Amino acid sequence: MKFRVDRDVLADAVAWAARSLPVRPSVPVLAGLLVETNPEGTGGLVLSTFDYETSAKATLPAEVSAEGRALVSGRLLADICRSLPNKPVEMSVEGAKVSLICGSARFSLQTMPVEEYPALPDMPAATGTVNSESFAAAVAQAVVAAGRDDMLPVLTGVRIEIEGDSISLLATDRFRLSHRELSWQPGATDASLAALVPARVLADTAKSLTAGAEVTIALATSGAGEGLIGFEGSAGGGVRRTTTRLLDGEFPKVRSLFPSQHVTVARVDKASLIESVKRVSLVAERNTAVQMAFAEDTLTLDAGSGDEAQASESIEASVKGEAITTGFNPQFLLDGLTAIEAEVVEMAFTQASKPAVMAGAGSLDAEADEDFRYLLMPRRLLS
């Protein structure tokens, strides 16, 4: 194996492929990154990683002078490529080692037994395409509410529901719930699919595939690729594909938790509310709520109690309906506010002890944007 490749293209592709490598692999070869030249007659360079859960494959242009394959430490190769000077990179296999030359810098890497490396799973059949920037933004909003407790694996995922030309992303950790909708171009107009995808992998993948205009989503309900979801995008003059195993289990039926009517609807400047919550929550003890009192044209935030430190701040708000006082975990509240992209946030309530629904709006008078909704459970207030 021998090839010559642009330094930036190689460094970017290696970093992308190595990002999902396990920190403590169950088998040593799973820490490796597979480097192949001209696989299946493609004429280029292919970098692959796989840990039996998530696979990554990057194809990139290169001047190949000898075909072959080698398995080297993925993290080490990523560190080396990141530090190389801005000159063409030459890599070749010399016996049991891989030689890497860039300018006057020379590295020799020990290879791992390539024959022990598992075969990567095939991509399921393409289901449709979505704008890459829109998809990355939507996923970033949805994963905010995903659980992080591996004892409840179902809640660490994002449920993707596909109906025709619409994709819904749902996530919950039992204390908050996110729902994001976006349009896409399905391969079949009657597409109706659902999948539970690990939130961390989905967020990382969506964010890493924004170089090209579109991302292809590949999801199979049966046959080849069943139990997998695949994503494909373009970057660095080549193609990047990733697959991940779907989570098992039944995602809770959460759509009905969004109420259809509200007794109080408040609108507040998002930036002002974020700053106020950050200030007031400085005195809130661990796991205690920040109180929010909505009345007429004012929102008053309070935190702290008794002989401990206390804080209070009032900001302007447009409040329609009954006055209401409730409280929320300040970090969960900030997570939702930060995820909303609009300048104004709408908070809608049925009663103080029930969840609030948050959404964005372009102005105090504009229609709420319900493409993204964030439902947040209240916390019991300290008397």
Map each language-model feature to its residues:
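Structural preference for solvent-exposed beta-strand-turn elements
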Residues: 1-383
